Amino acid sequence: MKNIIASLLLASSALVSVNASDPVMIGRRGCGYAVENTAEAYHEGARRGFTMMEAHVRATADSVFVTSHDGKTDRLGGHMKIAASTIADLRSETYSQQRDSATYSGSTICTVGEFLDICKEKGVAPLLHLKTFSKDTKDCGHLSPLVGLIREKGMEGSCVILTSEPDYIEYLMATHPDIRLQYQADAKWQEMFEWSTARGLDVQIRADLVDADCVRRYHDAGVKVNVWTVNTPDEYSRLSNLGVDYMVTDYLCPESL
């Protein structure tokens, strides 16, 4: 499978014309060449040329922000629930993951602070993808401490916060208006179009839901479109020709396009 992906990447230059309007490629969970959402994935993503990388954000029982897509660590070989575990507990686990034909192992949990440090060192813009911190989405108590961490690391100028929760958006716009935001609209993009464009929010939409009319409407409203997940040259070509502004990918590294 990895050989097939490599062949597709090499062929992509023949399928896609490179120009000034090329989308920003975002390394999904770092990149697809290490255990997802770990320091190794972020270092490898930066090495492969990503100028923006995504990290999913959750909070531990002792209020440390960590990078993890799932609320539990079992998919990566752990056995803990992040919200019920301390950072010290989570540090005791070692993670592994099979991605296509390769198996990656030996990684441990990464904190958001560490992710931001890597981004700052490598000159990469961080995309912090918030997972829901509480069943009550009006409980926004974690958001100001997260913004405080972003400021502490000196990354407020380049960091983007992505969330599907309108309550989080409203809170952040009211309390931290300088922080850049994206709204994850997906299948709700038409339903939420007026709400998001009235706030000048860039949007993220799943790739199969994006067509020319979708991109045109958002661009006419003066906002940008981010699509996920784009892992083939054909899909890259289709979406690039539509004029999308960002693409989230595991494998389509900028150095290969």
Residue ranges and their predicted role:
Residues 17-257:
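Phosphate-group recognition and catalysis centered on beta-loop-alpha active-site segments
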